[in-house]
Curated annotation (Swiss-Prot):
Compartment(s) where it occurs, according to its Swiss-Prot or TrEMBL record: Plastid, Chloroplast thylakoid membrane
Membrane topology, from the record: Multi-pass membrane protein
Name of the protein: NAD(P)H-quinone oxidoreductase subunit 4L, chloroplastic
GO biological process, one term: photosynthesis, light reaction
Lineage, highest ranks first: Eukaryota, Viridiplantae, Streptophyta, Embryophyta, Tracheophyta
Its EC number(s): 7.1.1.-
Amino acid sequence: MMLEYVLFLSAYLFSIGIYGLITSRNMVRALMCLELILNAVNINLVTFSDLFDSRQLKGDIFSIFVIAIAAAEAAIGPAIVSSIYRNRKSIRINQSNLLNK
């Protein structure tokens, strides 16, 4: 019975993240929504790792790997956003066309 609640929470977080990522025009908000998506994936990995095979920690180890990737994204993402803001004076996604030039 607890599995359904955890999966519902994970699906709810994932859908909020996807909705925010699709509708967001601000780069900082898009990064926050990406973090929500990664956290929902981590919840699923840990839940299914515990459910199917609790002796082997493959899902837990992969979840730690995803957390490390999210930490790198949280460190590099704002640096890229601040660099774009310094050059373009805007952090709106639809106004940043750096690859067009």
